[in-house]
Every structure is written in C-alpha cells, then in structure tokens.
Amino acid sequence: EQSLTHYSEINRSFASDCLSEPVSAITVEYYQTYFLSLYDRHLSKATVSTYIRHIKIFLKWLEVEYNLDLQTKKIKVPKSPKKNPHIYTNTELQQIFALIHKDDSWLSLRNCAIVSLMLDSGLRQNEACLLKTCDVDMSRQILKVFGKGEKERFVPLGNMSRQFLQEYFAKCPYHKKYVFCSKDGSQITRNAVKLFMNKLAAQLPFEFGSHRLRHNFATNFLIDQYNEKGSMDIYALLTILGHEDVKTTERYLHIANQVIYSTSHISHLDKIMGF
C-alpha cells in the first residue's frame, strides 16, 4: 500500500510537469532535463534512482495502453549506491532506550516495546501496527505476524521485548484487538510510529529508523549464530524476516561476514612487531 502511494506521488508530480507539453516534445532530452532537476531538490542518488525507475514503469504503461512511442528504451535507470546499514554498538543501544524510556508511562512503554520488537524480532513498521493481542504468545515467546501480502509467519519474542509488552499491557488503559494503540485508544497508525521515530532520530547522533532496526536484527541474528554455532543459517533468517527470495536475505550474510572478519582480524604486523 505504501509502495503504491509512493509510486502514485512520483508519477503525479512528473505528469503535472509535462501536461502542458505535446507528446512530440517528450523526448530523451526532456527526460534528462527533468531527471537532472531532481538532483536540484537535494534528493539522494538512491531516491533519484527510485524516481526514474517508477517514471519509466509509468511511461512504458502509457506506451502500451495508448500505442505511443515515448522512447522509454533510452531511459537509463542509474544504479542505487549500496550502503551497508549501521550496526549499533552496545552504547548506542543504551542511548536509544534511555531516550525512549524516560518515564514509566504507558506511552513510553509502548514505544519501547515497538522499538524492541523491530530490533529483536525483525518486525516491519506496518507489522508492529497490525500486531494483534491474540497473536502474542507470552509463555512460548512467539509472535504470529502478518507481513506483505497477508502472509503469516512466526517470529521469536525476546525476554526484554516480553518485559516491555507485559509492562505496557499492565499500564495501558485500553484493551483492544490490536496490541499498540494511540492516546485515544484507537489502533496506532504508521504515521504515528514514523513521527515518534523521527523525533528520536533527531535526538540521536547516529542513523536511526525502523528499517535500520530491522537491518540490525538481521545482521546480529547471523553474527550471534556464528558465535554460538560456528555457522549462519540464512534460510532461518529468511523465514523470520518474511522474505520470498533468498537473494534479499543474502545481503545480511555479506554484512555479517564483514563485521565478523573485522572484529576477529589478526594483524600480521602486530605479530611481527610484538604488539
């Protein structure tokens, strides 16, 4: 749903820019000028790449639907620069929860529980909003989650997350179908979660957000497996994250290996020089 909204917004903006132009004026040069203007808006390279990809899909649909030649084959989508997610240190994790858990109000405990579930169970933002009370199994420490396409999966519930949930349930004045609610008792929305995440991000000296919390879960899941078992189960992680394609999950294998190698690196020079 969010992806469709984003797609519509991008193409609505593009369409409003070229409505006054005749079809004959919509050339490769026109596209280049428009795409360059995106950089003038101070958008990141990754965002511009997303804009161009969505616009190209829209134009290809117009070509087929209205039998037009909009030269879409000449539109080159730039590759998004790949950036490894920041893996939080123990100190940074303490900073995050110290900011959220300023008091023992039910709203503070709610926010702690949401962040904890993203960080320790790998929930997406929308999955946290849609989590039902009946799908939380405290005794077995399991959550039933409905992900993209309403696909059901089970994810682990850590001790800290369980404690936050128990304290939140005990203090929340509302007892509803969904686990997390707003001040008025209604189901919490993605915008509400995004708002408090943005407020937190503004107070932290490092990158923070729901996607980064999920990335941290995935990377640390593999690192912990390696430290405990000497191997990493990519398919177990795929199941927990709700991915359909193992290639999506494999990026975390690469990141986890980087972290493991960097922390266990044996310096040849140190050995020679006696350090």
Regions found by a protein language model. Give the residues of each.
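Conserved catalytic core of the tyrosine transesterase superfamily
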Residues: E1-F275
